[in-house]
Design a protein with these regions (language model features):
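Feature captures hydrophobic
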Residues: 1-175, 181-185, 211
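Conserved class I S-adenosyl-L-methionine
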Residues: 191-198
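Conserved SAM-binding loop of SAM-dependent methyltransferases across substrates and taxa
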Residues: 201-212
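Conserved SAM-binding motif I beta-strand of class I
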Residues: 214-219
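Conserved SAM-binding strand-loop segment of SAM-dependent methyltransferases
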Residues: 235-248
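A short acidic, Gly/Pro-enriched loop at the edge of an enzyme's catalytic core
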Residues: 247-260
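A short glycine-rich, Lys/Arg-flanked "PGG" loop and its adjoining helix->strand segment in the class I
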Residues: 273-288
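Substrate-binding/catalytic lobe of Class I Rossmann-like enzymes that use SAM or dcSAM, i.e.
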Residues: 295-393, 397-403, 411-412
């Protein structure tokens, strides 16, 4: 029963002792004698309702409540995936600052190195990357669009990071600044044709289409396709939507595009060589590709993300490997810049928006979906804040025929 273990739990329970030891190691001074300020005091409530402070003096930043035996077993295993699932299922509750709680992730382990070996490596090889993408993308992006629209920016509904001048700047202004940057950096003008890879809920299609640009947005998500078709009809945009995988896209009877924009889709295109070859086929010589992505170790996704957020072989951009593949092509790297803080702010603002809609989300879609996404967004914010993940944007230029000079690097940061 759910109370059998609870009755046996006391303040001397091994979990309390182990948590205190791990917290002490996490907050111990480093080689320079500086304490880890990320480790915060928190309160642990056991199933018998006894409360135990973990950490030093001061007000607890958050409270972990163990609700059931399953929650006790998950936390006692110090298994990150098990703890995440216990939280989503209601076997663990957390009150207070979730971002502060996630700064204690180093006390947990992710002991599932081979759990997703099949979906990451073997399944795309056996069944084909394109076919598996169609299933994997649906698992995330075909959640009811109204759910996403509750917490994305209200102006463009962008699901990629923004560019912020101040930490307290609105999500809407940060997103619009990034879109303007990509638009201008690619030299896009009214009447030109632009390919938008993974159009989402019509963010770039709307931004550029309202300026007279003929945008072709590619998607393999049903919800995305429906949203963009409705947007085009409602606003009278000179744009089109193509339901096709980018790697299979072969337009017939049309010239190459004047620009290609890839907002946060590189993570879903892990075959860099094939992707760059497709860029080269679809882009006019002398024109540019804008892309941005979160970056880090290739296939270095936590088990929670691989199982519950982005299934399959979605992978952070591996900058070293990507640039090595670019070097094999005619493309020139014009701009590359670090966006880690911008991505942190984007995830933080999304998470805050979602938390503000907590009651509505739970009423319409259930507690599990709410907790899955709030945990995902705050854990992503934590990864960017701590440097577990980074992010970059890049501009590539395809030289015109007979070009005698390289474009040159305008920015590296």
């Amino acid at each position: 029963s759910q109370t059998s273990t609870a009755e046996a739990v006391t303040g001397d329970h091994p979990l309390v002792q182990e948590l205190r030891q791990r917290h002490a190691r996490l907050s111990a001074p480093d080689d320079r004698g500086e304490r880890n300020e990320r480790a915060r005091t928190f309160e642990l409530r056991l199933p018998d309702r006894s409360a135990h402070v973990i950490g030093g003096p001061g007000e607890p930043a958050f409270t972990v409540q163990i609700v059931t035996d399953k929650g006790l077993a998950a936390l006692s295993a110090f298994d990150e995936l098990a703890v995440a699932e216990a939280y989503m299922n209601g076997d663990l509750d957390l009150e207070g600052d979730l971002l502060a709680a996630l700064k204690h992730r180093p006390v947990l382990a992710d002991p599932h190195p081979f759990k997703y070996l099949y979906s990451t490596y073997l399944e795309p090889l056996l069944r084909g990357q394109v076919e598996r993408d169609k299933t994997w993308i649906k698992s995330h992006y075909d959640v009811d669009r109204d759910f996403f629209l509750l917490w994305l920016d209200s102006r463009l509904r962008a699901y990629s990071h923004g560019f912020f001048e101040r930490d307290d700047e609105s999500l809407e202004d940060g997103m619009e600044r990034k879109f303007r940057y990509a638009f201008d950096a690619c030299g896009i003008r009214p009447g030109q044709r632009v390919l938008d890879i993974g159009g989402g809920w019509g963010s770039f299609l709307q931004f550029a289409g309202e300026q007279g640009v003929r945008v072709t947005s590619i998607t393999i998500s049903d919800e995305s396709e429906r949203t963009m078709r409705e947007l085009i009809a409602r606003r009278g945009l000179p744009c089109e939507v193509v339901k096709e995988h980018f790697l299979e896209y072969k337009p017939v009877g049309s010239e190459p595009f004047d620009a290609i924009v890839n907002l946060g889709v590189t993570e879903h295109l892990p075959d860099y060589r094939r992707t760059l070859a497709q860029y080269q086929r679809l882009l006019k010589p002398g024109r540019r590709v804008y892309l941005d992505a979160y970056s880090g170790a290739r296939h270095g996704m936590p088990s929670f993300i691989s199982k519950w957020v982005f299934q399959g072989n979605t992978s952070p951009l591996n900058l070293e490997k990507y640039l090595a593949e670019v070097a094999r092509t005619p493309f020139e790297v014009v701009v590359i810049k670090n966006d880690r803080h911008n991505y942190f702010l984007s995830c933080k603002k999304w998470a805050e928006n979602l938390e503000a809609k907590r009651d509505e989300v739970i009423a319409r879609w259930g507690r599990h979906l709410y907790r899955r996404f709030v945990l995902y967004l705050w854990s992503a914010a934590n990864s960017f804040e701590t440097g577990m993940l980074s992010a970059h944007h890049m501009i590539l230029q395809l030289p015109a025929p007979g070009s005698a000079h390289r474009a040159g690097l305008e920015s590296w940061a």
